[in-house]
C-alpha cells in the first residue's frame, strides 16, 4: 500500500463532509467524488439488514474487493492519503479495521441536538439527482 487510508468516523450530519473537504484541500490527499461509498463497504454483505457488520463478515473475498477499490482509487488519482467518511462505518469499526488495518482514524463528535436539527432540514430537502448520479458510479455490480 503506497498511500495512507484515513477513515473519518461520525454520525450523519456531524461535520464529516466538512472535515473531509478540508483535508482534501492538501496536495496528494483525496477522496471519492461522491458523499459515501457504503455500497463498496457492503460488497459481499448486501443481504445484511443493517450496516452493523461484525469482524467475521470481513471474509477474504470481501476484504480483497474493498481493498482493491481503495488501492485503485488511490493509484488512479496519485494520492498519498485517501480519506473515507461513510457514516455507517461508525456501526462497524472492528469490521473496517479488519479490512484496512493500516487506516488512521479521526473521530468527530457533534452535539446530538444540532445533528437532529441538521438532519431534519436535509430530510425535507428536494431530491438532488446530481448527487445520486455521483453515488451510482460507485455502486458495484453484483
What is each PLM-predicted segment?
Residues 8-10, 33, 82-85, 107-109:
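Short beta-strand segments
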Residues 44-46, 87-142:
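PAPS-dependent sulfotransferase catalytic domain
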Residues 3-4, 78-80, 102-104:
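Short coil/turn segments at beta-strand junctions that form active-site/ligand-binding loops
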Residues 70-95:
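Glycine-rich phosphate-binding loop used to anchor ATP phosphates in small-molecule kinases
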Residues 1-76, 126-129, 133-140:
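PAPS-dependent sulfotransferase catalytic core
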Amino acid at each position: 500500500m503506497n498511500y495512507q487510508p484515513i477513515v473519518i468516523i461520525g454520525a450523519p450530519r456531524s461535520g464529516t463532509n466538512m472535515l473531509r473537504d478540508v483535508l482534501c484541500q492538501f496536495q496528494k490527499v483525496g477522496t471519492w467524488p461522491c458523499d459515501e461509498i457504503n455500497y463498496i463497504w457492503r460488497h459481499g454483505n448486501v443481504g445484511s439488514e443493517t450496516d452493523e457488520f461484525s469482524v467475521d463478515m470481513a471474509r477474504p473475498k470481501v476484504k480483497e474487493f474493498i481493498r482493491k477499490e481503495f488501492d485503485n482509487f488511490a493509484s488512479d488519482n496519485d494520492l498519498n492519503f485517501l480519506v473515507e467518511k461513510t457514516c455507517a462505518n461508525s456501526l462497524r469499526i472492528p469490521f473496517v479495521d479488519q479490512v484496512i488495518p493500516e487506516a488512521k482514524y479521526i473521530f468527530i463528535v457533534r452535539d446530538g441536538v444540532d445533528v437532529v436539527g441538521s438532519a431534519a432540514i436535509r430530510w425535507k430537502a428536494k431530491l438532488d439527482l446530481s448527487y445520486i448520479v455521483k453515488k451510482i458510479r460507485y455502486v458495484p455490480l453484483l
